[in-house]
Amino acid sequence: MQAFLKGTSVSAKAQLTKDRGTPATAGSSGETKKVKPVPWVEKYRPKCVDEVAFQDEVVAVLRKSLEGADLPNLLFYGPPGTGKTSTILAAARELFGPELFRLRVLELNASDERGIQVVREKVKNFAQLTVSGSRSDGKPCPPFKIVILDEADSMTSAAQAALRRTMEKESKTTRFCLICNYVSRIIEPLTSRCSKFRFKPLSDKIQQERLLDIAEKENVKIGNEEIAYLVKISEGDLRKAITFLQSATRLTGGKEVSEDVITDIAGVIPAATIDGIFTACHSGSFDKLEAVVKNLIDEGHAATQLVNQLHDAIIENENLSDKHKSIITEKLAEVDKCLADGADEHLQLMSLCATVMQQLTQNC
């Protein structure tokens, strides 16, 4: 009887497993295929060089290089979010195809250890590997690899100097692409060995068109004014704008995305709060000013964010003379430096707002 029960249990378990496996098989055949969630920044990253927006000169040169399969060492520099990394990744995919892309490309960014030891070992070992000149699909493939050093301006001078010799020795089998925001932080011997390309800041129109296209594909309810506001607070960084758009969409849960939602997502200080600071400064009351600053800190707003937004508000203020603007701007620079050095936020903001109050009351 016990054996019989065991047998029944086993057979029942087998039947249960079989039954459970049936819908999984049906799902794997394509009827109910589950799509993996992907960040929109990666989902809408350019897949080929021609999809790169607003960088016509760079695209034209790369297109000629891809046609001849003759790629020089590259140096991409420009503001963040303008497509530097996306451009070289798209070019590498076109050169090597999806099957060889992982084998032929080594990508290192600021999150990786990139001291002199890494340049001497990891980069050098990868560069010394020999590769064939053909792909599995029969298409021609250049006989070299690509090393992408993202945020190269954060590398030490010693690591950059070590990289110089590696670039020379492995020129037959490896091409290097250095990506940075500030080209002045790259040593001259490296820049002289690379073809330099400056990535221009994306215009507001280009960014708005791209965001509207993504919003349409993702069925996001958002108006043109909200898109324009999103572009403004992103400060020319399209990557940041796309991330804010996705976060705002998830927060609203399918409802229309408003400016207030975008403000909360982006960590921007509301315009009403900035106006409240100016109102307190105009009043000439130090007690009112202290209450406003204390409330600002209690709400969790970043002091550096306030400095940036106050700077824009001061520059656009038509009631202030150029002399008063210059005094306040100089104070903004001092406060920004002190905050970067770890000074107390409350004291620095009080000092800044006191200067603004002094200039506003003198101007009246």
UniProtKB/Swiss-Prot annotation:
Main location: nucleus
Note: Despite of the presence of a putative ATP-binding motif, this protein does not bind ATP.
GO molecular function: ATP binding; ATP hydrolysis activity; DNA binding; DNA clamp loader activity; enzyme binding; single-stranded DNA helicase activity
Sequence similarity: Belongs to the activator 1 small subunits family.
Function: Subunit of the replication factor C (RFC) complex which acts during elongation of primed DNA templates by DNA polymerases delta and epsilon, and is necessary for ATP-dependent loading of proliferating cell nuclear antigen (PCNA) onto primed DNA. The RFC4 subunit probably functions as a scaffold on which the other complex components can assemble.
Assigned keywords, A-Z: Acetylation, ATP-binding, DNA replication, Nucleotide-binding, Nucleus
Cross-referenced Pfam families: AAA, RCF1-5-like_lid, Rep_fac_C
Chain positions with N6-acetyllysine modification: K6, K13
Coiled-coil region list: none
Protein name: Replication factor C subunit 4
Assembly description: Subunit of the RFC complex, an heteropentameric complex consisting of a large subunit RFC1 and four small subunits RFC2, RFC3, RFC4 and RFC5; the RFC complex interacts with PCNA. Forms an heterotetrameric complex with RFC2, RFC3 and RFC5; this complex has ATPase activity but is not stimulated by PCNA. The heterotetramer of subunits RFC2, RFC3, RFC4 and RFC5 interacts with RAD17. Interacts with ATAD5. Interacts with CTF18. Interacts with CNTD1; this interaction facilitates crossover formation.
A biological process term (GO) from this entry: positive regulation of DNA-directed DNA polymerase activity
Residue positions binding ATP: G78, P79, P80, G81, T82, G83, K84, T85
Record's subcellular location: Nucleus
GO-annotated cellular components: Ctf18 RFC-like complex; DNA replication factor C complex; Elg1 RFC-like complex; nucleoplasm
PTM-bearing positions, type N-acetylmethionine: M1
InterPro entries: AAA+_ATPase, ATPase_AAA_core, DNA_pol3_clamp-load_cplx_C, DNA_Rep/Repair_Clamp_Loader, P-loop_NTPase, Rep_factorC_C, RFC_lid
